[in-house]
């Protein structure tokens, strides 16, 4: 019989659908912008060639680090365990929401490669909703784990990996 993954906290029931809609919209807009750039010639090839090398390195870093965060956070959270366990090691020791941050970094990396104002607006909306969802989950984790999670919040930043700001009180 397959083992069922046991969760400590809860997730908003519509969150998966919201993510699918936003990420799909982002991808469609990016693809449409690429087609329209080829069709209408804006921005010029010269502008793209001159800016591309400058933006390539941060884009690759954002995408690679984002993939790393998502991969490692999934491995930690979805590891088969007999009882649910609070994970505060690995990527969870540097940021409280590595899955969300990883996804945001991947999309931001693609924005560096091919900027689209509409896709940027979608990214901002996605960030705001990720922050809302993270806060929703944290309230539940505080209820379930109490002081253990409150201590974790004081040690580990919510979003900014290298930030000294740990949590809102």
PLM feature spans:
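Membrane-interface loop-to-helix entry segments
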Residues: 91-105
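Membrane-anchoring alpha-helices and their flanking helix-loop junctions
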Residues: 1-88, 104-169
